[in-house]
């Protein structure tokens, strides 16, 4: 795996499809994708000449995500992580999105052909195991405009808009309203309690990765259950210099949402490769009226907000964050018999 991420050459069985060990490495990286409350709402099928991605409706958060928008976004992030991992290992992905109209859960089929990895592929793949969702306060250092421009250019390749939020006071008010609305929603709170503040679980948000929400922060955080992560010393949330970025699409159908997830992946990995801390923000987009307010504030009639992202520089005294858990590949990947024999 180290050689692959360092770009020292593709590991392949032949010129048509990667061998079993390469596929395993690819999917190990793919499932490191962030997802709403770390539900990991995906499953994979390995076929003789392709990889198939499916959503898991049983992992949909019915109160937090009633129409399944964030489920599709999460799977889009995993899809792009897979594409990046393949490229770093010497395989160009050919993605067919929603290939089966009769199966709404079948989100993508990924074919491959040989590819010589470039440095960008290698850098993005190397960022996958290093990326963390860092909900803590960031330092006061600003994010360079050129860095944001690169993220926007990469998102645009997939037809997704990235805009920096300039009116932070108004955005803070929108987010605070979403937090307030959720506090009075008993079903939402029950769901949040189930999926956060966890210890020793293979899914959900661990307590060790949750700081307490601070209302003085430029953008208030979600009120997770049982937060167990301390803020860095001598860091005031009010001085947080993070940039707030919004990803939006021209339409709001399932394809647009999947593409937005893919764009979120490339922005998060680009930020990580630059040494930036990052954190998706989805709470204000989970309620119709606050999502409409974000749309009016950032995109107007020209786009639908799909995800907000907080990007900035972690304080120099911030402790490294542990990785969040993932299910074993055996729980989320279906292997064909011939590749199972290769693994034995």
Swiss-Prot record:
One of its GO terms (cellular component) is cytosol. Induction: A member of the dormancy regulon. Induced in response to reduced oxygen tension (hypoxia), low levels of nitric oxide (NO) and carbon monoxide (CO). It is hoped that this regulon will give insight into the latent, or dormant phase of infection. FMN binds at residues 40-44, 326. It comes from the Bacteria. This protein serves as an immunogenic antigen, inducing gamma-interferon responses in whole-blood cultures from M.tuberculosis-exposed adults in Uganda, and The Gambia but not from South Africa, indicating this might be a good vaccine candidate. Gene3D superfamilies: NADH Oxidase. GO terms for molecular function: oxidoreductase activity. Signal peptide: none annotated. Keywords: Flavoprotein, FMN, NAD, NADP, Oxidoreductase, Virulence. The keyword Oxidoreductase applies. Disulfide bonds: none annotated. Its cofactor is FMN. Was identified as a high-confidence drug target. Belongs to the nitroreductase family. Stimulates pro-inflammatory cytokine expression via TLR2 signaling pathway. Activation of TLR2 results in the phosphorylation and activation of NF-kappa-B. Also induces TLR2 expression. May influence the innate immune responses to facilitate the survival of M.tuberculosis in the granulomatous microenvironment. Interacts with human TLR2. This is Putative NAD(P)H nitroreductase Rv3131. It comes from Mycobacterium tuberculosis (strain ATCC 25618 / H37Rv).
């Amino acid at each position: 795996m180290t050689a692959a991420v360092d770009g020292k050459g593709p590991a392949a069985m032949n010129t048509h499809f990667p061998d079993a060990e390469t596929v395993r490495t690819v999917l190990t990286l793919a499932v490191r994708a962030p997802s709403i409350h770390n539900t990991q709402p995906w499953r994979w099928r390995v076929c003789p000449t392709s990889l198939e991605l499916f959503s898991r409706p049983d992992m949909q958060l019915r109160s937090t995500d009633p129409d399944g928008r964030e489920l599709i976004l999460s799977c889009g992030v995993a899809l792009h992580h897979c594409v990046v991992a393949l490229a770093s290992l010497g395989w160009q992905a050919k993605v067919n999105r929603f290939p089966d109209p009769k199966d709404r859960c079948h989100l993508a089929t990924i074919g491959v052909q040989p590819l010589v990895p470039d440095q960008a592929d290698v850098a993005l793949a190397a960022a996958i195991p290093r990326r963390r969702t860092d909900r803590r306060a960031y330092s006061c250092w600003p994010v360079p405009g050129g860095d944001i421009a690169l993220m926007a250019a990469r998102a645009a390749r997939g037809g997704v808009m990235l805009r920096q939020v300039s009116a932070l006071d108004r955005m803070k008010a929108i987010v605070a309203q979403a937090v307030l609305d959720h506090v009075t929603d008993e079903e939402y709170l029950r769901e949040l309690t189930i999926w956060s503040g966890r210890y020793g679980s293979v899914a959900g948000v661990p307590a060790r990765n949750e700081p307490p929400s601070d209302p003085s922060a430029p953008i208030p955080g979600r009120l997770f259950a049982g937060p167990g992560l301390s803020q860095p010393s001598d860091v005031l949330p009010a001085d947080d210099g993070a940039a707030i970025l919004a990803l939006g699409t021209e339409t709001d159908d399932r394809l647009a949402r999947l593409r937005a997830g893919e764009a979120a992946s490339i922005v998060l990995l680009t930020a990580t490769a630059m040494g930036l801390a990052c954190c998706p923000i989805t709470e204000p987009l989970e309620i119709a009226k606050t999502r409409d307010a974000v749309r009016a504030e950032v995109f107007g009639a020209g786009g639908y907000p799909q995800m907000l992202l907080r990007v900035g520089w972690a304080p120099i005294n911030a402790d490294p964050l542990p990785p969040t858990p993932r299910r074993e590949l055996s729980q989320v990947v279906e292997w064909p018999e011939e590749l199972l024999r290769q693994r034995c």
